[in-house]
Amino acid sequence: MLAPKHRLRSTSLFGKTIRNGRKKGSRTVVVHVLVGGEGAEALPAPLQEAATAGPRMGLVVSKAVGNAVTRHNTSRKIRHAFRTVLDEGKLDFPAGTTLVIRALPKSAEASFEELVGDVRSCIRRAFPR
């Protein structure tokens, strides 16, 4: 399970991350990354605080992935894949980083190892050099 401090729950932050963040994709997922709470000043005060906390991840799994059971299993695998990448400590997330991971239909058939590799790769490529 993902710790509450790493969960992205605000609709405003979801939208802002998808609209203004960098997007990188793979065969199984698309990752949107908004670094350092960029644009947080335009949010209401309670959300500004959330936008500057350390990496928060939201998940989008559409009906194109499969039925409810398939979507739920896929979201659990992706959430765990993100947690694995986070726990590795190899990626240095700047304060206020928000990520939205969108599952593609192929993610339902992918193994956990594939998902970890794709999530790690997309996050690495999305960060500015």
Briefly describe each language-model feature range.
Residues 1-129:
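Positively charged, solvent-exposed patches that mediate nucleic-acid binding
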